[in-house]
């Protein structure tokens, strides 16, 4: 297979995670996953930006993409996409947890962490489920996520979906 084919395939493999991660900002209010609780350091666990409603939307959109992908691959992709979406959101929540520990408020910027937390979460479950991802596919997805995150967040800011352009 060609490198171009492998890179396009990696986009298809990671598409549920990208869709799940990108769907969260459309939910403006909801029940915080941390129920407003603080960690031992006195700061919120995740913050108001991580809600059950946002998680449900992310899982729904990511899994729906997986159902479509399963028509081209195998039926297993419905389950894989659900778990990939879930782990992408877990990665995103871990990123929020780290930011809160560093004293960075909701909407605060941490270059690298903001763009790659969901990719790392999705990659973990893909590896555990034995989905064949090469290192260059992984690095390509990390680069793509980094630049797409910058662009899509700026557009979301212009459309008043997000409060900050990052």
Swiss-Prot record:
Keywords: Cell membrane, Lipid biosynthesis, Lipid metabolism, Magnesium, Membrane, Phospholipid biosynthesis, Phospholipid metabolism, Transferase, Transmembrane, Transmembrane helix. Pfam families: CarS-like (PF01864). It is a multi-pass membrane protein. Catalyzes the formation of CDP-2,3-bis-(O-geranylgeranyl)-sn-glycerol (CDP-archaeol) from 2,3-bis-(O-geranylgeranyl)-sn-glycerol 1-phosphate (DGGGP) and CTP. This reaction is the third ether-bond-formation step in the biosynthesis of archaeal membrane lipids. PANTHER family: CDP-ARCHAEOL SYNTHASE. Belongs to the CDP-archaeol synthase family. The chain crosses the membrane at residues 7-27, 55-75, 78-98, 116-136, 138-158. NCBIfam families: PRK04032.1. One of its GO terms (cellular component) is plasma membrane. It catalyses: 2,3-bis-O-(geranylgeranyl)-sn-glycerol 1-phosphate + CTP + H(+) = CDP-2,3-bis-O-(geranylgeranyl)-sn-glycerol + diphosphate. Its cofactor is Mg(2+). Its EC number is 2.7.7.67. It is found in: Cell membrane. This is CDP-archaeol synthase. GO terms for biological process: glycerophospholipid biosynthetic process. Its main location: membrane. HAMAP family: CDP_archaeol_synth.
